[in-house]
Every structure is written in C-alpha cells, then in structure tokens.
From Swiss-Prot:
Name by which UniProt lists this protein: 4-diphosphocytidyl-2-C-methyl-D-erythritol kinase
Pathway: Isoprenoid biosynthesis; isopentenyl diphosphate biosynthesis via DXP pathway; isopentenyl diphosphate from 1-deoxy-D-xylulose 5-phosphate: step 3/6
Family: Belongs to the GHMP kinase family. IspE subfamily.
Entries under SUPFAM superfamilies matching the protein: GHMP Kinase, C-terminal domain, Ribosomal protein S5 domain 2-like
Gene Ontology terms describing biological process: isopentenyl diphosphate biosynthetic process, methylerythritol 4-phosphate pathway; terpenoid biosynthetic process
GO MF entry, a single one: ATP binding
Coiled-coil blocks: none
Keyword flag Membrane: no
Functional summary from the UniProt entry: Catalyzes the phosphorylation of the position 2 hydroxy group of 4-diphosphocytidyl-2C-methyl-D-erythritol.
EC number(s) on file: 2.7.1.148
Uppermost EC category: transferase
Stored InterPro entries: GHMP_kinase_C_dom (IPR013750), GHMP_kinase_C_sf (IPR036554), GHMP_kinase_N_dom (IPR006204), IspE (IPR004424), Ribosomal_Su5_D2-typ_SF (IPR020568), Ribsml_uS5_D2-typ_fold_subgr (IPR014721)
Length: 284
C-alpha cells in the first residue's frame, strides 16, 4: 500500500540579529559570535516514504541546483547512510525564501529534511545526532535542527539558547546575490572584533561586521538599507543581501512595506524564538 504524503513541514528563515567576526582559524574558517532568531516566513516541504531506496526531489526551483549539490538530497542521503535505512522518500519543495540572501533557506531546508525523515522513517536519532549530521553539511544547519533562538560561537556550531524580544520585521531582498565565500575571503572584512560575554553582547547595540563591506560592493544592498533606515533600526542578515528593519507593531511594518519602492521586494514576518518546525514536529 502506498504511504500517505506528510505535508506542510516548515523550513523557516533565520535572521542574524548581530554578527561579529572574531578571527580566522588555520583551516580557513572564521571564528564568530552571532545571534540567530527565526521568523515565520518559510519554505514548505512535503514527504512521502517509499519502499525503494531512491530519493526524489520535486521543486518549483528545479534546475537551479544540481541534485548532487542539493542540500535536501544530501541531508536525506546522509540520514539513510547513518541509520542504514533501506527505504527512501519522495520530497516536494515549495521554495519561498530568496536564495543567497542571508536567510539560511538552503540550510533550513536540509534541517527540516533531517527532522521530518527521522520521524517518518522512524530512525529515532536524537536531536544531537541529527545536528552532527547537519554540521557536516553546513555550519548553520544545527541551529535549525535544535529549533530555538540561539547565541552561536565557533564557526556557528556552539549554541546557547536565548530569548531575545520577538518584534515584527520588514525584510527586503535586494536584487543581488552575495557570495558568502567572497565576503569571507575579502581582505577588507573586519576580523578582529573582540570576543565578548553573552550578557554584554545582548545588552549593547547590535551590528553586523559584514555589512560595511557588502554595502560598499553592492549598490542594491546599500539602497535597500538606506531606504529601510528611514523607517526603523535596520541591519543586514548574514553576509546579505537581505536587510531587515525592526518594528514593535505589525501594522507599522505593513505601513512601511506599502511604501516600498517598486524596484524592491520585501515581506513582513514575526520574530520567533521557537521554530515553526518544532511546533510542526510536536503536532503531527
């Protein structure tokens, strides 16, 4: 008998509420301190367990990323191999998050795949075991698997649960694809921000060490940030290109969105300290 499709597994976006680069390691990775918070704007995935070991992905972004590079398929394959699960899955992705925008969409898709298939395949790995699989695929996948707003250190893998305010955000996605690798390789990137205690970081003004460099190289990011700063305290997330402004009320964010210039795209979303994925997992 054919298995039913398990629907509406969310893969939420994240924002880096601050991002400090503390140094570069001998292996080329950067030491950082950052604060992750989720927003209620998500890709959505559906899953169907199959008897065959084949992994099939259907996506409204078909052809953009080769199957061998697709984090969803790599995550599913890694879980198969780790657990020796003999079956497979058919996966449907409804891609809503901008690609390459600093919102973590690809990592979130991979995390949701690991969490959902661990449940649907009944492979019974712990959250920590899933996070270890995820870390091999991407440094920010573990925070999506754990599903709680977190202060992160190291290359982003050492997590401490925190509960920052949950404002409304207006997120603008400039028409620019910023290469994370190029940003971190740029000699002008600040790499010497002192490491600070979490209490100090949580109480001071929040900045993104990548922002000045990206704004100088990408006029679209500079324009979006300049516009948004007229309405609210605003910063870039990750290495960009997306920027976000903080509002205390949804109506304030929607009013600003209504004035968004026609050459920009944006959306309003709520900050969330508990990921929608955790809610979905606990309410199958």
């Amino acid at each position: 008998m054919s298995a039913a499709i398990s629907r509406n597994w969310p893969a939420p976006a994240k924002l880096n509420l601050f991002l400090h680069i503390n140094g570069r390691r001998t292996d080329g990775y950067h030491e950082l301190q950052t604060l992750f918070q989720f927003i209620d704007y998500c890709d959505m995935l559906d899953f169907k367990v199959t008897d065959s070991s084949e992994l099939i992905l259907h996506s409204n972004m078909a052809g953009v990323v080769a199957d061998s590079d697709n984090l969803i398929l790599r995550a599913a394959k890694s879980l198969q191999q780790m657990t020796s699960f003999k079956g497979g899955a058919e996966i449907w992705l409804d891609k809503r998050l901008p690609m390459g925008g600093g919102l973590g969409g690809g990592s979130s898709d991979a995390a949701t795949t690991l969490v959902a298939l661990n449940t649907l395949w009944n492979t019974q790995l712990s959250t920590e075991e899933l996070a270890k699989i995820g870390l091999k695929l991407g440094a920010d996948i573990p925070v999506f698997i754990h599903g709680f707003a977190a202060f992160a250190e190291g290359i982003g893998e050492r997590l401490q649960v925190v509960s920052p305010p949950e404002p409304w955000y207006l997120v603008i996605a400039p028409d620019a694809h910023v290469s994370t690798a190029e940003v971190f390789q740029d000699p002008l990137l600040p790499r010497n921000t002192p490491k600070l205690a979490i209490d100090t970081l949580m109480s001071q003004a929040w900045i993104n060490d990548c922002q000045k460099l990206v704004v100088s190289k990408y006029p679209q990011v500079a324009k979006a940030l300049g516009w948004l700063l007229e309405y609210a305290p605003s910063r870039m997330t990750g290495t960009g290109a997306c920027v976000f402004g903080e509002f205390t009320q949804q109506q304030q964010a929607l009013a600003a969105l209504a004035k968004l210039p026609s050459d920009m795209q944006g959306f309003v979303a709520k900050g969330m300290n508990i990921s929608p994925l955790i809610t979905r997992l606990n309410h199958p």
